[in-house]
């Protein structure tokens, strides 16, 4: 797949809330995921299975998702980024709006890294 195809497919799946499908389909086995140092309860991990498990961990912290939007991807070289806005209720933390930018690196037709900024 080209970077354009990967970026568009990942965006499509994220808009549908199918994050795990995106990871299983588009990520390299040795992909990395980097969270900001201030991320509540989430850590940076290496490996597709660890990324999927981190997604499960995040979902276990969510009481309800009220709405979410994901921007069209912006592509530059081997990287693409998307912005997301999620209106959600976190367990024990109440309702909040989470805004983030995600930057993805692609190599050999797979996502090899993701990094989140929020």
Predicted features by range, described:
Residues 1-19:
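Short, aromatic-enriched amphipathic alpha-helices that serve as compact interaction elements
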Residues 5, 20, 24-72:
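A solvent-exposed, acidic/Ser-Thr-rich amphipathic alpha-helical stretch
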Residues 27, 86-88, 102, 118:
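Short beta-strand segments enriched in hydrophobic/aromatic residues
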Residues 68-73, 85, 99-104:
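Hydrophobic/aromatic beta-strand elements that line small-molecule binding cavities or substrate pockets
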Residues 76-86:
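A short hydrophobic beta-strand element
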Residues 88-96:
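Short, cysteine-centered beta-strand-loop-beta hairpins and adjacent loop/turn segments enriched
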Residues 99-118:
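Short beta-strand edge/turn micro-motifs at domain boundaries
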């Amino acid at each position: 797949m080209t970077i354009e195809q990967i970026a568009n497919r990942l965006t499509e799946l994220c808009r549908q809330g199918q994050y795990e499908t995106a990871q299983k389909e588009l990520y390299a086995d040795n992909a990395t995921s980097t969270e900001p140092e201030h991320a509540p309860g989430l850590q940076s991990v290496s490996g597709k299975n660890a990324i999927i498990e981190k997604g499960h961990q995040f979902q276990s912290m969510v009481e309800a998702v009220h709405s979410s939007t994901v921007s069209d991807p912006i592509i530059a070289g081997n990287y693409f980024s998307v912005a997301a806005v999620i209106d959600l209720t976190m367990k024990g933390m109440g309702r909040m709006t989470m805004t983030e930018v995600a930057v993805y690196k692609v190599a050999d037709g797979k996502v090899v890294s993701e990094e989140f900024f929020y």
